[in-house]
Amino acid sequence: MKLLILTCLVAAAFAMPRLHSRNAVSSQTQQQHSSSEEIFKQPKYLNLNQEFVNNMNRQRALLTEQNDEIKVTMDAASEEQAMASAQEDSSISSSSEESEEAIPNITEQKNIANEDMLNQCTLEQLQRQFKYNQLLQKASLAKQASLFQQPSLVQQASLFQQPSLLQQASLFQQPSMAQQASLLQQLLLAQQPSLALQVSPAQQSSLVQQAFLAQQASLAQKHHPRLSQSYYPHMEQPYRMNAYSQVQMRHPMSVVDQALAQFSVQPFPQIFQYDAFPLWAYFPQDMQYLTPKAVLNTFKPIVSKDTEKTNVW
């Protein structure tokens, strides 16, 4: 074992100087190679620099070209924008002019429409007036024709009115005849009481009725106003109001109003003569008028004059 170790050591000792020499040789060779490579590498470096510079120049040229193109495009775009703005301005001005022209046209159209409406209304009014005038002319012609035909009608009416006038005259003349008949009957009854007793009760009642009718006719015709050919209903109400105001203000009534009041206030008609029965058998003919003031005065409370001075507890 010892021998083997020794041999290994000897071999290692012998091998050590050789490796050093080899390393020295290798370092020298490397230096030589590096120097030669440097000699050869110098033109390559220069070439690379030239290529880099050339590339840079190319890039600069490309950039300048791109800038020129961008400038050209910008100029074209600005020109296009200017043209578009000019066109827009021209279109706006033209549209404004058109709108300004259109606004008066619209107003003119409205005015024309209004004038047309007014003309239509005036035409309709004229047509209506023309129709109305035609109707008036027809009515006037009809009236004229009726006026030409009226004389015959007036004559007929006068013929019809003549008997009525005669009747009115006879009615105004009748009271005296009736009064004469009543006086004659009273004289006969007063002079011939025996004959009146011999007459039957039926005949007496008929005579009494005739006398009563004659008296009523005489009274009615005394107070009956004159008959007029025309009747005015609006004159009736003022007459009633005047009569009521006379009663309310306690003015003395005329004889005609008293007779009319007696005649209208009778609750039952008078059938028999005044001398046939005693006075208590007849109904009263005069009625007392009651005014609203007299009725209201009855309900006023009676109070002494010193009521204001007295204290109410």
Curated annotation (Swiss-Prot):
UniProt keyword annotations, A-Z: Milk protein, Phosphoprotein, Repeat, Secreted, Signal
Tissues with expression: Mammary gland specific. Secreted in milk.
Record's compositionally biased regions (Low complexity): 77-96
Phosphoserine found at: 90-91, 93-96
PROSITE patterns the UniProt entry points to: CASEIN_ALPHA_BETA (PS00306)
Region (15 X 6 AA tandem repeats): 135-224
Localization per record: Secreted
Signal sequence, renumbered to the chain: 1-15
Highest taxon of the lineage: Eukaryota
Positions of Sequence repeats: 135-140, 141-146, 147-152, 153-158, 159-164, 165-170, 171-176, 177-182, 183-188, 189-194, 195-200, 201-206, 207-212, 213-218, 219-224
Primary location: secreted
Annotated spans, Disordered: 77-111
InterPro entries: Alpha-s1_casein, Casein, Casein_CS
Recorded GO CC terms: extracellular region
Function: Important role in the capacity of milk to transport calcium phosphate.
Family the entry assigns: Belongs to the alpha-casein family.
Protein known as: Alpha-S1-casein
Annotated source species: Mus musculus
